[in-house]
Amino acid sequence: AESSHGFVQEITCCSPLGIAVVDNKIIVSQPPDLIVYTDVNRNARFDQGIDQREVLLTGFSGANHDHSLHSVTVGPNGQYYFNHGNKGSQVTDKEGWELNAGSFYGMKQVSGKPSSDGQVYNGGVALRVNPDGTGMRPIGHNFRNSYEQAASSLGDVFQNDNDDPQACRTTW
């Protein structure tokens, strides 16, 4: 890029670990929230009263911590794919489906607590959700700190778990 500029500035956005631009939507991973800004007038600036700000999901632990909520990518099915590290989460989607994911590193109060599907999720979790905040479902868990994922045209999702342990490997 030959130039850059700020789109939005908020006191609560102090160290987002992911920014995705999907058409006129800017998706910011700022724990505890996954925020969607919609640039309604498409002028590449957030205009209060014209543009929209929505907290799509909330409940991700680890504000200002690298083992928290990471960036969104879009799969071939149009769903948002994202993950969070092992700081944990207790997140409810727009339909009321609840994810509980704890670990020794964070959110110990939900460790061992089943999510809405009856499953117990540990550590970092990879997820998908519809753009309207419904249909959130885990697609993998027990990661340390996976930063981002890529979805193939066939829907396979690849990610690389981050950090020191030998167990941190590329998964799909």
What do these predicted ranges mean?
Residues A1-W172:
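Beta-propeller domains with acidic blade repeats across secreted/periplasmic ectodomains
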